[in-house]
Amino acid sequence: IMTMDEMRAEFGDDVAHLVDGVTKLKHLHLTDSTKDPKDKNADRLEMQAENLRKMFLAMAKDIRVILIKLADRLHNMRTLKYQSKEAQQRIARETQDIYCPIAQRLGISKIKIELEDLCMKYLYPDAYYDLVEKVALRKTERDTYIQGLVNDVKKYVSDAGIKAEIYGRAKHFFSIYKKMVNQDKTIDQIYDLFAIRILVDTIPDCYAVLGIIHEKYKPIPGRFKDYIAMPKQNMYQSLHTTLIGPSGQPFEIQIRTYEMHRTAEYGIAAHWKYKETNNGNATTTTVTEEEKLSWLRQILEWQQDMSDNKEFMTLLKSDLNLFSDNVFAFTPSGDVKNLPKGSTPIDFAYSIHSAVGNKMVGAKVNGKLVPIDY
């Protein structure tokens, strides 16, 4: 095992900094692997999960630390079959409550989608395998139908002189399952099991394609969303519209630019450094520090349904300050205590129990002995 000093000497400050950040985050875990909404402890567990999410972001001063942790958790979930059933449940629940929301808030849909499907596989195995089987039953028929639509849309867009990449994609299992549960429907009653995605070069092209599509297919009222004019809080942008297909079956189309697609797939990671191709020549574009900070400020707006504007502004203020008004600490049982700025070890002790505070004689912070009023 290498010390931080040895790590720094061998690999440099940057690598040591990342390892230190990832090491600190390894202690983050939920202490209870079950969360039944009817359980009297459900509210406490949800509060603990929210504290853990905030602590996760507050501790990771470098966004790359979070990206490493997400990649590490994805690897853990992919190899979860080798764990005991109890460990599978605990890790999957922890992933669903902590890591999936963080991937969502960072806009990294590729990781979020795979994590959600893997969580469903271990938390709701009966529903998962039943859904997999039912989706597979009509796969050939559905693929033929999707390809026919894609070919038609390609022709319409090409005839208008717009350069575009067009393809069909299946919705992931957890999103289908969530819709079935929320809408109390069977899979046969869920019509949008797939979507057609259209990638173009410019924003004007997005709206031009939308006009073409609405001319060729009848749009369903109330099913159009303009996330280009009004991006989601994680910076996701696209035009979404649901239409009636040739056979009368509804289908969804998403229209976005290549840059929007990169953001939708990789979120904040796409905005650090990425390769562009201009006339066949690869170039590297690096986002400025100001743009990074602007991005971070926006993604830290927690995606929650606020009961009023005051509640939203209070939450927004704390997030824009990167949780600078909070001190997070672990109890011996693994719970997270969210304390006000300026709190000392003695405050933490009393937050656990008055008996703990009364008997406290010393404290250790980040591995070092400190006074109780540190």
Spans of features found by a protein language model:
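Ubiquitin-like/PB1-type beta-grasp interaction modules and other compact soluble beta-rich domains
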Residues: 307-341, 346, 351-374
